[in-house]
């Protein structure tokens, strides 16, 4: 607590805060790249708006961490993180999987920062971080849900393709089976907004 009385943060916490701010910007850039990739995808227009929103949220988080560092008169020294060299994010499932990996890495950094704050008795930092940790948990759960949803869509699409391929010219009477017409179609792609 002596460090807080002087208005300073421990070096360990300063370094961890800089790392988290830098990684938030990195995630924001990756999400912006994903948003740009899906901007003209007529089959998955919601991916564009989702990733654009997340890019804005992550950039705002980075600003909040930097503001916290400035509040305690700490040096801002953001480590450089190489931007992903991905121009083709692929299917929605692949993009969500990439997003989930980014969020899990960010969660690890936040947990490390929390551990540093606890070791150094930085109670103000622990209070400040709570909302980010809670939101991170929600984001990861949301992306896991979306990943499972995308897998279900793929499975459903594969099932619908199989009867067409396997049936061929079936039935001597020339009548089509009703089961294909009555099977439920997969729900439309929908990505609801995560809590921010």
Model-predicted segments: where are they?
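Iron-associated oxidoreductase/ferritin-like identity signal
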Residues: 1-196
